[in-house]
């Protein structure tokens, strides 16, 4: 039923955090402040990524049509309506970080091995320097991220279209700013990146790339890809590529939730969202 169904204050806060991550890709100030009264930095990061991880897994299970084992059928309540609140029309962007990046001169040896394994002495991105406050979490998360960015079966152009679209939908300006650069390296033009923000119906897409943008939209809105869009992608893509489409969108929705909720601030030389109106 949700956080207002007679829970104690703490349990209701945890449920509300899950709702806010799902609806808004963002933890409200009220929820964040309540969590900070009991949780340390690493636990706060774990709250965000636990909720985000299972949203990601739900998107994958729904899109692939994974059927529950027979013994699990009775676990999902069938007599409770699934109430989904409307997301904010304009996602919020925090003007200051909730968790600050670790300054370079405060890096421990462990953090230095994570963020600067080659000993360059240069600072890492603000997101990485923030997540490094939880080294135990950082290591496996970096492996997942590296797969999407460098090991995926998808062409770089396709990967960046999907990442930019989900970043735009989630209001994750930091994610957009980083991947505008990556998109240009993969051959995306400024006009095409503006078209990504406008969506699948924007003039100029070829049918297949429009289907990719639509897949990101459907995953964001419904946690699944419609059969029509799936069939359109499957006409060209292998099973591995179809999996990577969902993994890319779901993985970067997770990143968006963290960026927004932690208040990761843009580096000074990064581009902001294009000014094209509402999502």
Language model regions located:
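Hydrophobic alpha-helical segments
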Residues: 1-279
């Amino acid at each position: 039923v949700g956080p207002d169904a007679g829970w104690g204050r703490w349990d209701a806060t945890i449920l509300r955090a899950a709702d806010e991550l799902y609806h808004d890709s963002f933890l409200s100030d009220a929820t964040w402040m309540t969590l900070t009264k009991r949780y340390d930095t690493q636990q706060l990061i774990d709250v965000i990524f636990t909720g985000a991880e299972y949203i990601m897994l739900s998107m994958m299970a729904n899109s692939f049509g994974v059927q529950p084992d027979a013994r699990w059928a009775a676990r999902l309540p069938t007599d409770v309506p699934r109430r989904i609140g409307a997301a904010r029309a304009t996602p919020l962007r925090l003007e200051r970080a909730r968790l600050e990046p670790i300054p370079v001169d405060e890096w421990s040896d462990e953090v230095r091995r994570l963020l600067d394994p080659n000993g360059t002495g240069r600072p890492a991105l603000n997101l990485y320097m923030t997540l490094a406050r939880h080294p135990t979490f950082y290591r496996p998360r970096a492996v997942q991220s590296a797969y999407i960015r460098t090991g995926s079966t998808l062409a770089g152009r396709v990967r960046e279209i999907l990442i930019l679209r989900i970043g735009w939908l989630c209001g994750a300006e930091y994610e957009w700013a980083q991947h505008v650069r990556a998109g240009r390296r993969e051959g995306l033009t400024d006009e095409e990146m503006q078209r990504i923000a406008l969506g699948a119906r924007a003039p100029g897409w070829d049918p297949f790339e429009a289907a990719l943008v639509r897949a990101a939209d459907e995953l964001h809105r419904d946690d699944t890809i419609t059969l029509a869009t799936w069939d359109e992608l499957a006409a060209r893509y292998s099973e591995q590529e179809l999996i990577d489409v969902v993994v890319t969108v779901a993985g970067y929705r997770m990143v968006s939730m963290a960026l927004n909720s932690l208040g990761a601030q843009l580096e000074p030389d990064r581009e902001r969202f294009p000014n094209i109106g509402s999502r």
